[in-house]
Amino acid sequence: MKVMQQTTHRTYPIRVAQVIGKAVISGVDSVVMNYYRHIDRSRIQFDFFMDGYNKTLIDEEILDLGGRIIKLEPYEASMRINMRQCRAAFTEGQYTIVHSHLNTLSCFPLYAALQAKVPIRIAHSHSTTSRGEWKRNLMKQALRPFSKTFATHYAACADYTARWLFGSKTIQKGQVRLIKNAVDTTLFSPNEKARERIRKEFGLENRFIVGHIGRFAFQKNHELLVRVFAEVYRQNPNAALILIGTGELETDIRSLVKELDIEKVVFFTGIRRDIPDFLNAFDVFFLPSRYEGMPVVGIEAQAVGLPCLMSDTVTKDTAITPLVEFFPLHASIPEWTQKLLSYEHARKRPYPELVRDSGFDIHHAAEDLCRWYESLFASLQKI
């Protein structure tokens, strides 16, 4: 696909190549889209570099907002082809800024950007690692030393993720830009009508609803989530579980739900666009992840006033309100069960001022990002 050309002369909008990998409508791509919707697009435009050739749920919105989409060969299929396509698109578009969100894998598109003579190359850390995911960890550890090699600038969603990828010294030198996983506090807010609508849609009007939003992947720990819920249901037949998302382990989790004989009270929704409504419908957001950077859905949940139970491996920076409680990942299933049961009558309370004051309001955060890109672009004219 042809990409709009751009030079280092001051022209607007400045087009930034956003390398997001797979678009799965959660996590990284959700964060980038939140910024894209709220950034001043007369000054900054995003072009999205995605792995895979299939149409995604965000394609149409990107095009409507003036962005461009460059589909790439998935790196799992051929890293060589993926990098060649990146290099060609970076060159054709004459980008001045490439912003890669692939954590340790950012070294590959940023090397392609270096070859294409892109002057500003941003490596962005969104996550960390887990002891149990040993095969992927080997690759992450092997690539981590190269995370800074081809980047000119560093960004992270939290100090924790910055330290993991770039090291403490880089943070101490003030070289890492903190870009928070900000949310739209006008969209993610208490909504009783939305709560009633979702509960009626699933026939759960008077039930204790445990909710989870995330990819069906090793990181998210769905097996523990489902086993804990099965015990919750046995002790409280009024409980129900809603799982939003898709992923490579979905079939396995469906089989586990069947094995545990809880199919009637576990609902798989696939990908949904009405996330604010679901968060309003839940009684508790359950996130027993093996590891997390800064889960944007955790910020969204707090914005609507939803109590959150998370594993203690989730970065503590996520707790921007008193709504978040961390629990030991390796606690026993009975311990997890009793803790989750305690949320049936937990009080919902929004803390909009805390979300805003913590820097997680997208309206302010998007303007900060816009100014940062402009300052990077302006610095080229001084060389």
Where in this protein do the model-derived segments appear?
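A short, active-site helix/loop in glycosyltransferases that binds the activated sugar's phosphate group
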Residues: F150-S189
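Aromatic "clamp/platform" in nucleotide-sugar-dependent glycosyltransferases that forms part
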Residues: I271, R290
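Nucleotide-activated donor-binding/catalytic signature segment of Leloir-type glycosyltransferases, i.e.
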Residues: R254-G270
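N-terminal strand-loop element at the rim of the active site
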Residues: K2-I14, Q18-N82, Q175, E248-E250, ...
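A conserved mid-protein helix/loop that constitutes part of the nucleotide-sugar donor-binding site
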Residues: D29-N34, F208, H212-E231, E248-R254
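Short His-centered aromatic/hydrophobic patch
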Residues: S100-S106, S125
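Short hydrophobic beta-strand element within catalytic cores of glycosyltransferases
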Residues: F49-M50, P307-S311, K316
